[in-house]
Design a protein with these regions (language model features):
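Post-Walker A alpha-helix
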Residues: 13-14
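Switch I (effector-binding) loop of TRAFAC-class P-loop GTPase G-domains
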Residues: 17-44
Length: 171
């Protein structure tokens, strides 16, 4: 889930259904205020949940705490959860809220995909370095997961993200 605008990067880029209007987006981080569910197939079997991005949002600490409770309750109730995508700004990865979600994945043995967004803001070597650091962290924590660089503006990483999501959704 997002700390870096999941709505714009995943849903409106729409890597699975190719529907450009799947989610409304905002230029301001933290506009997602509730859990939004998007059905991505005709059989109504596969869904993506867009969770409030409390790690990067300009909201009060109280609101951040409320979102953290909402997200934790939601994730704990999802029997059919196939994996968790955490989108982070590659220049500011692993905020406290990111680490909380990563710990949750570790505790629940949930597959994890870390999308290091805005990779167009770094050099290729900088992107590789950040992706390697994230993958090393996942390995040290014995997590089922991987990290990848991503840029919605340059379309970098779209194929890898699409491939991973399709595997999770068995499509």
């Amino acid at each position: 889930r997002s700390h870096c605008d999941w709505s714009s990067d995943v849903c409106s880029s729409d890597l699975i259904t190719r529907n450009k209007k799947l989610a409304k987006t905002s230029k301001t981080p933290g506009r997602t205020r509730a859990i939004n569910i998007f059905t991505i197939d005709d059989q109504n079997l596969n869904r993506i949940a867009d969770l409030p991005g409390y790690g990067f949002a300009r909201v009060s600490k109280q609101t951040q705490r409320e979102w953290a409770k909402l997200i934790t309750a939601y994730l704990n109730s999802r029997q059919s959860l196939r994996g968790l995508v955490i989108i982070m700004d590659i220049r500011h990865p692993f905020k406290e809220s990111d680490l909380t979600l990563i710990d949750w994945c570790s505790e629940t043995n949930t597959p994890l995909l870390i999308v290091l967004n805005k990779s167009d803001k770094l050099s290729k070597s900088g992107v590789l370095r950040e992706v390697e650091k994230a993958n090393l962290m996942l390995k040290q924590m014995n997590l089922k997961g991987q990290a990848l660089g991503f840029s919605s503006t340059k379309t970098t990483g779209i194929e890898k993200l699409d491939e991973k999501l399709k595997r999770w959704f068995d499509v």
